[in-house]
Swiss-Prot record:
GO terms for biological process: apoptotic process involved in morphogenesis; autophagosome assembly; execution phase of apoptosis; insulin catabolic process; insulin receptor recycling; lipoprotein catabolic process; positive regulation of apoptotic process; proteolysis. GO terms for molecular function: aspartic-type endopeptidase activity. Residues 1-20 form the signal peptide. Pfam families: Asp. Glycans are attached at N133, N251. This is Cathepsin D.
Amino acid sequence: MAPRGLLVLLLLALVGPCAALIRIPLTKFTSTRRMLTEVGSEIPDMNAITQFLKFKLGFADLAEPTPEILKNYMDAQYYGEIGIGTPPQKFTVVFDTGSSNLWVPSVHCHLLDIACLLHHKYDASKSSTYVENGTEFAIHYGTGSLSGFLSQDTVTLGNLKIKNQIFGEAVKQPGITFIAAKFDGILGMAFPRISVDKVTPFFDNVMQQKLIEKNIFSFYLNRDPTAQPGGELLLGGTDPKYYSGDFSWVNVTRKAYWQVHMDSVDVANGLTLCKGGCEAIVDTGTSLITGPTKEVKELQTAIGAKPLIKGQYVISCDKISSLPVVTLMLGGKPYQLTGEQYVFKVSAQGETICLSGFSGLDVPPPGGPLWILGDVFIGPYYTVFDRDNDSVGFAKCV
């Protein structure tokens, strides 16, 4: 072989196994809450289960992990596929930037665990790369504790193979949320600080194993309910076909969740919230935008929303096109949301109703108050999560 050819091979060997871009198509599905609404079933009280997200915050010292969020996934709307084991056992998961652990149902789940019976289950005996761990784990949700034990195996995402990933095998899943869920489990993509049992999060393993060229991942969430794919998770870069213009960046202010500083929330009719600035979390695991209850009530009034039941607000469907623009200021840049973008249309018992995409949620100090920017915000704005620079970038979706 010519010396030049040998040099090329040597350079390739030195570069290592880095992949260019890993594309994971996301499927959009009807959230559990909306599905229950459409069939007229009882919806768990939002206040009783702290609405869409509840945080067990009393942040620990920096040397200690922050206590895990208390969270439910009644409003999750996007999932993708991963594999666990060799050969890969397939699971659908919510890629959640609001938590840090990976878990899927276990073949050892309790006989009466209906959620487990209805979903794919991991079977260690069928994997040649399984390594026993056995540590018990529990994640506390508003409806109870999801519990099980830890195991270690290879996780496949696209054409990436992430070795030695510790994950949870769930043997008990609480409440109706996971029974009705279209997804099998959760893949957390937040920082190690909030990882239960100090497990190394999935994306941290990707970084440590140098599997991608840039330690970033990005989300495109298609808000058109009839379009496919429902969205895309991209590891290692961004996809220009989904956005226009340059990214505007904001620094992460607390490396636990993807938490950033928000300058203000402005309604076109003159109302300003988050005066003087506030903290916000960018969270792909929930669909709504939440904020302190008192402020969100003012916001609902300003957009003409009326209280319905259990924390939900209804808006007259024929007024959507004339609703005031709501502008979130981040890093000195305005991010506008129109009525078409912050209102959901839901079919309920043969009738169509329109629900506000905002919800009240009080997160106590020292962690709060907080705003949560879910899919209502991420949908119109292509979002990049950058671990190299601990920042979040936004660009307008096309």
